[in-house]
Amino acid sequence: MKNIVPDYRLDMVGEPCPYPAVATLEAMPQLKKGEILEVVSDCPQSINNIPLDARNHGYTVLDIQQDGPTIRYLIQK
């Protein structure tokens, strides 16, 4: 995947689930169509919650990268 530069970053490292998913869904409506939010989380359950919730709300999950316990999501409105 080419190098995508997000418009905004939401750092949820250290926050327990479901807060990363909830915060992602609260942040997304503030973006303009086409803008990208980077979400960083170390909650293991977020790998299931964040992509599913984003898709269910009509957002596009562009990329998911895991580096040790940290998971990085790129979500486009």
Swiss-Prot record:
CDD domains: YedF. One of its GO terms (biological process) is DNA damage response. InterPro entries: TusA-like, TusA-like_sf, YedF. Coiled coil: none annotated. It comes from the Bacteria. The active site is at C17. Belongs to the sulfur carrier protein TusA family. This is Putative sulfur carrier protein YedF. It comes from Escherichia coli (strain K12). The gene is yedF.
